[in-house]
Amino acid sequence: MANNLESNISQIVLKKFLPGFMSDIVLCKTVDRQLLSGEINSNTGDSVSFKRPHQFKSERTETGDITGKDKNGLFSAKATGKVGKYITVAVEWTQIEEALKLNQLDQILSPIHERMVTDLETELAHFMMNNGALSLGSPNTAIKKWADVAQTASFIKDIGIKTGENYAIMDPWSAQRLADAQSGLHAADQLVRTAWENAQISGNFGGIRALMSNGLASRKQGDFDGAITVKTAPNVDYLSVKDSYQFTVALTGATPSKTGFLKAGDQLKFTSTHWLNQQSKQTLYNGSTAMSFTATVLEETNSTASGDVTVKLSGVPIYDEKNSQYNAVDAKVKAGDAVSIIGTAKQQMKPNLFYNKFFCGLGTIPLPKLHSLDSAVATYEGFSIRVHKYADGDANKQMMRFDLLPAYVCFNPHMGGQFFGNP
């Protein structure tokens, strides 16, 4: 039956738009999209909170008598999701109308959903880069051997992450450099493949799914220098950080009066404090070397005239003697501890990402229909998208707009991070 161009146009266009949009996404498929579903809407404001899981400690005794022992407390903790900015593509109605008449709607819609997916996945990549606390490899060293990929699976397993899929996301050039190991490449014989299928380098390599993406975020390192140490020991007991998994620390020894001394995405290494396996609470080792705790800068910060820097970090060296089941590290960060900044000052880079599916979450706000007879909203596999036909009276034009409003949450910064190759 021919398309009726007089009514329900937005609904017709939306039905065509959604499958193409889903076919284009890659990065969005690797993070949790269910926990945000139904929790955040147009009435929740700019944030929404999610409950973090409880952890418990065990008592080891000779007789089983736990008289006088501290019992596990139930502490309610939350992760807070933030609503982003609208992603909107507006086009003149005449383009859509002509495509409908000629049965060429797919060709017109393709660049629209490609643009929306690109914006969405680049913003998601920035969010993930700035929130993941883990760090592997040598900055700006290319991924060129499968051992560079396998290190991510080793770290995720060793730190005690057991549930959900694990991913290593690399730029497209990494696939070329890994192409000599043909047995590791993902293969499929279908003629038409989605962006997800085309992105796969390896379906499962040592417990990690290797994917390529052109949506990874690039950044420039801060203008840092100096022998950095902790000036004041931060408060990192569980009750102080449970709702954010972020902390602020005062450092000293920086080059004085530097604007942009640290930038968002920079990673700090606390060399005297080491990661624990989150289940067994044993110190992590790579060979004979204990793995130092790392955290990621959330906001750009300057150094003072006296060489001090106060920085907000994602990832927390939790050390709580009373609630040790939540400990992330083997020792408390102390004043005087050495801190190194990973990488080179003012270095341009595009980090690869590795993480567990439950590191971050993505959702979209169900948007209300605009005041019009021709406005459609649909939720499809966790994505809510609005299509609206309207008139621009001032410009004397008929228009159609496509809208999506994303929301992002970091459930646990200790479940993801940046990685590079090794020299």
UniProtKB/Swiss-Prot annotation:
Subcellular localization(s) per the UniProt record: Virion
Stretch list, region Disordered: 47-67
Keywords: Capsid protein, Late protein, Virion
Chief localization: virion
Highest taxon of the lineage: Viruses
InterPro entries for the chain: Phage_coat_Gp5
Pfam families: P22_CoatProtein (PF11651)
Biased composition (Basic and acidic residues): 56-67
GO cellular component entries: viral capsid
Role played: Assembles to form an icosahedral capsid.
Protein known as: Major capsid protein
Source organism: Acyrthosiphon pisum secondary endosymbiont phage 1
Gene: 24
